[in-house]
Regions:
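Sec-dependent bacterial lipoprotein signal peptides
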Residues: 1-18
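Cross-family detector of peptidyl-prolyl cis-trans isomerase
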Residues: 5, 18-168
Length: 168
């Protein structure tokens, strides 16, 4: 009898502890970061000088949606698969890209704030161009390659062309 009682008490605890939690349990939350007025002005001047039109997000990120996509919008805990090209707005130098095959996958919450704010603006299959100020990008610190060569100087403004291939 004691064994059955123990089993009846233990079973719900085991089931609850093994059940899938909600998305808030993923460990990531929405960042409240936003661009400064100086950063916003820089991007506005860049867009104007290059005859580009973009929409300003409430965070100070600017974007153009080339294709809105059709299904599944990314959330902070979503696994996203993308193809992308990242370049420096100052000189157009491409510092990173992944445009081959099925793309590369990340948890959105692991990425820079600019991507966290921008990718949910499109759906699965969509394409977006993001103009990201330093405060929503890599910040004040240099980013180096595997050889220690600086590929993204601190306080860089970044442009990413992104194809959101899949959202899970």
């Amino acid at each position: 009898m004691k064994k059955w009682f123990f089993l009846l008490i233990s079973l719900p605890v085991i089931i609850i502890s093994c059940s899938k939690g909600d998305e808030s349990a993923c460990g990531f939350s929405d960042s409240g970061a936003s661009a400064s007025a100086v950063e916003i002005s820089y991007i506005q001047n860049y867009l104007s000088a290059n005859s580009l039109t973009a929409t300003q997000h409430s965070s100070g990120l600017f974007y153009t949606i080339d294709d809105p996509g059709t299904t599944n919008t990314a959330a902070i805990c979503s696994n996203v698969t993308v193809n992308y090209t990242g370049s420096l707005m100052a000189n157009g130098v491409v510092f990173d890209s992944n445009n081959s095959g099925a793309g590369i996958s990340f948890v959105l919450g692991q990425l820079m704030v600019g991507w966290q704010k921008g990718l949910p603006l499109i759906k699965n299959g969509g394409r977006i161009t993001l103009y990201i100020p330093p405060s929503l990008g890599y910040g004040a610190y240099d980013r180096t390659d595997n050889n220690g060569v600086v590929v993204i100087p601190g306080n860089s403004y970044l442009k990413f062309s992104i194809h959101l291939r899949d959202v899970q």
